[in-house]
Amino acid sequence: MPHSPTQRRAIVLVSGGLDSTTTLAIAQAEGFTVNALSFSYGQRHAVELEAARRVTQAFAVERHVIATIDLRQFGGSALTDSIGVPKQRSLETMGAGIPVTYVPARNTVFLSFALAWAEVLEANDVFIGVNALDYSGYPDCRPEYISAFQTMANLATKRGVEGTGVLTIHTPLIALTKGQIIRRGLDLGVDYALTHSCYDPSAEGEACGTCDSCLLRLKGFAENGLEDPVRYVGARSRAAG
């Protein structure tokens, strides 16, 4: 459905994790009517979709769509294949190369879906919570990638060619540390107990505490002198530090 002249709709990619939830909060704070897009892509940590539902309900988004695409058909990642998730890696090691948790072309696939929905809604804005500081070295989280995709998007769409709408991809977290991201979210009232970040959760959905995503999350809470409110394996929660 097209939007009214006074309504600003945005597509926000929402995984259910810490970064995407903060991004959703930022989009709403900037006055956008949010349509949230999540993906069931055969991920090892499918429990994140329950977190995405909790988050989008808490923020009362206009609509939440969970698109289904089975990337297990290709594999090639610890998140979609029978490859072990790296544990207890140092921050230096995380930044030294592209890890096996990288899902080939995932953000390109996700942003393409977001672009298609944005055209239908006549929305000019897409938000994605990529980060190029405290991250695991994924190539599709870099500023130059986002810039290139935005250029492509405006060349590849009816609205872009006709000049009736210019798409902007917003990356409000791209230059923030994990600690800064958490502080921004807390200032906006985000309840991080609703979120899920772990790549290798237990059968009960508890975070492992040792994968890259958990370690970066714990680092962010420690930087704020706070305890992470989610449950970890072997403990009710994980204290800062």
Curated annotation (Swiss-Prot):
Zn(2+) binds at residues 198, 208, 211, 214. GO terms for biological process: queuosine biosynthetic process. Its EC number is 6.3.4.20. It holds the Pfam family QueC. Binds 1 zinc ion per subunit. Its cofactor is Zn(2+). InterPro entries: QueC, Rossmann-like_a/b/a_fold. GO terms for molecular function: ATP binding; ligase activity, forming carbon-nitrogen bonds; zinc ion binding. Gene3D superfamilies: HUPs. The keyword Zinc applies. Pathway: Purine metabolism; 7-cyano-7-deazaguanine biosynthesis. Keywords: ATP-binding, Ligase, Metal-binding, Nucleotide-binding, Queuosine biosynthesis, Zinc. It catalyses: 7-carboxy-7-deazaguanine + NH4(+) + ATP = 7-cyano-7-deazaguanine + ADP + phosphate + H2O + H(+). The keyword Flavoprotein does not apply. ATP binds at residues 14-24. Catalyzes the ATP-dependent conversion of 7-carboxy-7-deazaguanine (CDG) to 7-cyano-7-deazaguanine (preQ(0)). PANTHER family: 7-CYANO-7-DEAZAGUANINE SYNTHASE (PTHR42914:SF1). Belongs to the QueC family. NCBIfam families: 7-cyano-7-deazaguanine synthase QueC. This is 7-cyano-7-deazaguanine synthase. It comes from Rhodospirillum rubrum (strain ATCC 11170 / ATH 1.1.1 / DSM 467 / LMG 4362 / NCIMB 8255 / S1). The gene is queC.
